[in-house]
């Protein structure tokens, strides 16, 4: 019965390509063949700490090279270029949940090996403040996390990490202002003693969000805090 319902829904409401937002030639692939070539994957040369692209001879990006990180390690799948910026805006603010289906599948395809090497006990999504979640209708990181957790068999917990401070937008803030903006913005109400935790989000920029979350989780006993995101900015 569920399979029949899915077929009917796919016919009535076919999924849209996350890049051009048109119906793909093959809806099972979830992306147009021509749009696939527009995805700019992070290559083999990346920061050993945060996963940002770096030059061949560099081990760390500029930011990770000059300051200590609270998180253990992180990786991202794609470069945050103009194509991905438009896709992420539609995903987050346009309620395009089907984009999350595609990106979660992509992370599981290309990031599975790394995630399983980290061997996390739990997956936590980056939380939204309740006002922002109400305005958007959903938390894109939570949607991604649940899809990834289900595929990889890792428990996902959404209610233990909260955004308690309704911070202003980070878009136009530099790294230092982002850190100040996020100070004391998150809180956790569980004990994570000895646990390895994987944080899921859509975009990694300066690392301020991941650092602040890792600080909170380690304060609650977490042994290691990793992250995986769809996109990352340039070094």
Label every PLM stretch briefly.
Residues 1-200, 205-235:
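Glycine-rich phosphate/pyrophosphate-handling loop used in enzymes and phosphotransfer proteins
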């Amino acid at each position: 019965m569920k399979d029949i319902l899915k077929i009917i829904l796919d016919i009535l409401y076919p999924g849209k390509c996350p890049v051009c937002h048109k119906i793909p030639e093959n809806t099972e692939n979830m992306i147009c063949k021509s749009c696939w070539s527009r995805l700019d994957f992070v290559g083999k040369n990346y920061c050993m700490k945060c996963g940002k692209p770096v030059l061949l001879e560099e081990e760390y990006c500029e930011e990770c090279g000059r300051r200590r990180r609270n998180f253990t390690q992180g990786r991202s799948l794609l470069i945050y270029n103009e194509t991905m910026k438009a896709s992420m805006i539609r995903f987050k603010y346009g309620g395009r949940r089907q984009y999350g289906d595609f990106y979660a599948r992509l992370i599981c395809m290309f990031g599975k090996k790394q995630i399983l090497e980290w061997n996390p006990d739990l997956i936590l999504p980056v939380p939204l403040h309740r006002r922002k979640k109400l305005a958007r209708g959903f938390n894109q990181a939570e949607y991604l996390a649940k899809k990834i957790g289900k595929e990889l068999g890792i428990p996902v917990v959404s209610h233990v990490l909260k955004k308690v401070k309704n911070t202003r937008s980070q878009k136009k803030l530099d790294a230092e202002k982002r850190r100040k903006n996020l100070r004391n913005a998150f809180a956790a109400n569980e004990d994570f003693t000895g646990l390895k935790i994987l944080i899921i989000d859509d975009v990694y920029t300066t690392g301020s969000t991941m650092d602040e979350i890792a600080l909170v989780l380690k304060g609650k006993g977490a042994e290691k805090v990793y992250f995986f995101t769809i996109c990352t900015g340039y070094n």
